[in-house]
Amino acid sequence: DIKKGEIFGLLGPNGSGKTTTLKLLLGLIFPTEGRALVLGKTTNDVAVKNRIGFLPEESCFYRFLNADEILDFYGQLFKISRKERKARIDRLVEQVGLGFARKRPLRQYSKGMLRRIGIAQALINDPDLIILDEPTSGLDPIGTRETKDIIVSLKERGKTVLLCSHLLSDVQDICDRVAILDKGKLQISGTIDELLSSKDVVEMLIRNLSDEAISEVETFIKEKHGEVISVKNSSGTLEGLFLKIYAANINNSKTDV
């Protein structure tokens, strides 16, 4: 049960049933038992399919077309007017960071660029439900961060996002709730906090404290029968460092100009 306006992560090892679940929701296959409802309707309802955007794990495009042309093609399939198609295409190519390459044929695109145009394709019909299968596959840290920002912005606009990814850090960053499948069965589901929080372990972030004061804090905790598991300096992430260097170089380039 996925709630309207949330980002829901679907996780599981290879062969767990994630792709089968997506195919059921898209009406590409049908259940042998029970039923699947999407936006309150059965999955064979054509009107419902018009309200869904889908990014498959591997996108197949006509590589001789450029970004504008491929998005226009998909827009025509949804019977979007020419004026509205142009407005959406202009917005989407900029949103996914492909404005500089919109007139290049897709055969000249890198894997990451093709992933970006795939995301734009999934949004061309302004869907209510967006299903994304490995959306950050092939993207560098900058593209990954921008893609996650796009997904969060969809939620802010009231869209519902179903996200499948093997990159658990991405899921943890942006998903409201997750479900874990294994061997075709739901193993567990809930919010990130519900699934990961531990009542027995408390984390404290402290700054501007001397080594002597830290030692006193440790002693106090032990006196209260607590256990200090580790004390170490705070560290960032490689993604954070990468983005920091990239932002600094961008600022330096602007200064040089």
Model-derived features: positions:
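ABC transporter nucleotide-binding domains
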Residues: I2-L163, L168-D182, I188
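Short, charged/small-residue-rich alpha-helical element at the C-terminal edge
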Residues: I192-V257
